[in-house]
Amino acid sequence: MKKIRFFALLLMFVLMISLAGCSGSGKKTIGIIQFGSHGSLNNCYDGVIKGLEENGINLDDYDVEYVNSNFDAGVSQTQANNLVNKKAAVIIAIATPSAVAAANAAADSGIPVVYCAVTDASVMENYTNVTGSSDIPDFSKQLEVVTGFMGRNNLKIGVLYSTEESSSPVQVESLKEAAKAYDGMEILDSAVADITTIDTKTNELIDRGVDCFVNLLDNTVVGKLETNILPITNEKKIPVFGSEIEQVKVGCAASASIEYINVGKDSGKAAAQILSGKATSEIPVSRTTEPNNYYNSKVCESLGLTVPSDISLNDTAE
């Protein structure tokens, strides 16, 4: 009887292991947490799906559970905890707040985490069983674009950033360092602790005499670009230079832009490798750094900006 009980328990244990990462349908679960919806993060998601499919993953064989945190880090944490409780086979987290939430939730669970578009990848170094893709802005290239359109170097540049995004203060310092190459250039930054105050913060920088704004890779601020920031700056005829192509499409003047479809593809490829049996330790973090230059001719015309002839540019205006 003891032997029968032992083998029954052993069989139950084997079944539990084999079903780890499976949903009620019997399929393994791929969890995807997107911090919020704006152009670059949506492109990341599309890239993740393409990266999975292009690297041998038939998504019909999996339950893909996609959740969106609507720019709320607390919601990201709850969503990550839920995916861990469901024993997802892998969790893909798009943007830094979601990545940190997923890594915290999955710690000691054995569930691998693949992050996507984490600008300061050092924030993930203390976690185990994680890998992913990093989007590193080239602020030197960005300032070449800004000064080309503005026609001078001695600019006061306004920067808004969210205190909830750990990579944003690092980006501010990198931008200030790049600005040292331009005589008379000054970076005026303003931290946004409460996103409902972003209108006030935008107007405060305008009152301080900024000539233009430069966006960081800050999802919380970029999420308010169309609804809050651009209506104010357009009325005052103050250009906003975006951090990626989708922002230029919706109203920024220009940008030295990383291709976020490719950032997402890199994370999708990493997740596919994990699902095919590779360990996260065998998959190096990918870093996208080389930008392409874009501008919006309609926006530039409305703001009275002259398109520089000495910079290679692609027009996003439709």
Predicted features by range, described:
Residues 273-318:
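Hinge/cleft segment of the Venus flytrap/periplasmic-binding protein
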Residues 48, 135-182, 284-300:
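An alpha-beta-alpha
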Residues 29-55, 65-74, 164, 219-224, ...:
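Extracytoplasmic "Venus flytrap"
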Residues 26-41, 132, 155-162, 213:
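Short beta-strand segments enriched in small/hydrophobic residues
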Residues 18-21:
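C-terminal motif of bacterial Sec signal peptides marking the signal peptidase cleavage site
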Residues 101, 105-140, 242-254:
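Flexible loop/hinge segments that line or gate small-molecule binding clefts
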